[in-house]
Amino acid sequence: MSVNDLRPGTTFLYDGNIYLVLEQAFSKTGRQQGKVTVKAKNMRTGARVELTFTGGEKVDKAMIERKEMQYLYNDGNDAYLMNTETYEQVSIPMTRLEWEKNFLVDGLMINMTEFENEVLGIDLPVKVELTVVEAEAAVKGDTTSGAQKKAILETGLEIMVPLFVNQGTKIIVSSADGKYVGRA
């Protein structure tokens, strides 16, 4: 595939790595051949890089497979997922799930991404239901609109929640930024 065809969301192979296009820009000056600048994420390491190609240069399209999986548990080193159709279990190193581990609860349905049977990572649901295990006491009289307090969730994630949220409350949290969305 030509680098001119790269668009956000496209995956491609370059220098032995798999990249996901985040942004793409084409620039041409005078008589020179155009340049394509791509901001991409290395799907193996998670590193974000900027790659520059000569217009018309070719790269291989990476066929990424997504499978719906159920999160089972983690043993500290690896997270274990199960394919609900075949009951096949797969493990992913927790080091690849630095942000995602804040939302992984038993039974959560997620999408696992893989390339040629190599597990690259997981895609979380947009919103996840979690339980508050510890919450600061609300200060009496602190009723300014939007007043918030700290709460620790069952996964260890610490977030700001409204004053009415107490220990044991089930809440909905955005997996994109870790912010409180609402009550479950």
UniProtKB/Swiss-Prot annotation:
Keywords: Cytoplasm, Elongation factor, Protein biosynthesis. It comes from Mycoplasma mycoides subsp. mycoides SC (strain CCUG 32753 / NCTC 10114 / PG1). One of its GO terms (cellular component) is cytoplasm. Pfam families: EFP, EFP_N, Elong-fact-P_C. One of its GO terms (molecular function) is translation elongation factor activity. This is Elongation factor P. The keyword NAD does not apply. Belongs to the elongation factor P family. SMART domains: EFP, Elong-fact-P_C. One of its GO terms (biological process) is peptide biosynthetic process. PANTHER family: ELONGATION FACTOR P, ELONGATION FACTOR P (EF-P) FAMILY PROTEIN. Pathway: Protein biosynthesis; polypeptide chain elongation. SUPFAM superfamilies: Nucleic acid-binding proteins, Translation proteins SH3-like domain. Involved in peptide bond synthesis. Stimulates efficient translation and peptide-bond synthesis on native or reconstituted 70S ribosomes in vitro. Probably functions indirectly by altering the affinity of the ribosome for aminoacyl-tRNA, thus increasing their reactivity as acceptors for peptidyl transferase. The keyword Protein biosynthesis applies. It is found in: Cytoplasm.
